[in-house]
Amino acid sequence: MMKGAKFSSLLVLFFIFPIAFAQLRVGFYSQSCPQAETIVRNLVRQRFGVTPTVTAALLRMHFHDCFVKGCDASLLIDSTNSEKTAGPNGSVREFDLIDRIKAQLEAACPSTVSCADIVTLATRDSVALAGGPSYSIPTGRRDGRVSNNLDVTLPGPTISVSGAVSLFTNKGMNTFDAVALLGAHTVGQGNCGLFSDRITSFQGTGRPDPSMDPALVTSLRNTCRNSATAALDQSSPLRFDNQFFKQIRKRRGVLQVDQRLASDPQTRGIVARYANNNAFFKRQFVRAMVKMGAVDVLTGRNGEIRRNCRRFN
């Protein structure tokens, strides 16, 4: 039944992204590098055992890569003006994990598995390790040959709900997808500077944001006295579940855009459905991740298969 459900979901997505899915497929490396997904999974599992926050880090990396020129690993390039140097990418980490995975794959199957697919697969595996869904995802992406920090225009935490949703709909997704992907904040961490005004002087009023639970204000103040970051899901910060949605319905959203999801007419009904049904949220999250993983991908003879994820060939 599960295999049929996965096939059905991918069939629907094929018609949504016909060009991308024409050359992406589940098991793309089954002949050329049959151990590829096992190598990725084992190294991610090792990292997760030491640093459970790897899930949040890889989700952030995958999102930031896909939403700038597509899922092409352009974020991984080291240079003085690459995407990696742009302000919004300053908090992206776990590049060293991608390097280790790439090194093992190159030893096993030289010039075969793209860095773009490594990021996609590693993110998928880290979500499952954190208690999220296990799912199949198409592979066959190729790596981009361009990485420019001027192309990075990712939104900040005060973006409106309509603005956030439009980022996803402009990429071929819908509102359910947008809210599901923002639900990845269930394992996220936020720099205290991103919400400091909400707990001190909201919009220059000298008082905290009235839409935030006062108990959360106090808790975040204490956290930010001793740490530069705070969990975006204060209930189960290392567990991939629907607690994030339950929290924002209780006025316990840490980022302003997260809290707005629970009250905006465009998204509050979806938030309620995800909060009330963890299985439904996880199914929708899988659909959204597969869609996002097909955004503006390079396939066939386009792009390249990098030998080192930090450098163009």
UniProtKB/Swiss-Prot annotation:
It is found in: Secreted. Its cofactor is heme b; Ca(2+). Induction: Positively light-regulated during the firt stage of development. Up-regulated transiently by a cold treatment. Induced in shoots of plants subjected to a long Fe deficiency stress. Down-regulated by salicylic acid, a plant defense-related signaling molecule. Keywords: Calcium, Disulfide bond, Heme, Hydrogen peroxide, Iron, Metal-binding, Oxidoreductase, Peroxidase, Secreted, Signal. The gene is PER57. There are 73 peroxidase genes in A.thaliana. The keyword Calcium applies. This is Peroxidase 57. Ca(2+) 1 binds at residues 65, 68, 70, 72, 74. Gene3D superfamilies: 1.10.520.10, Peroxidase, domain 2. It comes from the Eukaryota. It catalyses: 2 a phenolic donor + H2O2 = 2 a phenolic radical donor + 2 H2O. The record marks 60 as: Transition state stabilizer. PROSITE patterns: PEROXIDASE_1, PEROXIDASE_2, PEROXIDASE_4. One of its GO terms (biological process) is response to oxidative stress. Belongs to the peroxidase family. Classical plant (class III) peroxidase subfamily. Disulfide bonds join 33-109, 66-71, 115-309, 192-224. Ca(2+) 2 binds at residues 186, 233, 236, 241. GO terms for cellular component: extracellular region; plant-type cell wall; plasmodesma. Substrate binds at residue 155. Binds 1 heme b (iron(II)-protoporphyrin IX) group per subunit. Binds 2 calcium ions per subunit.
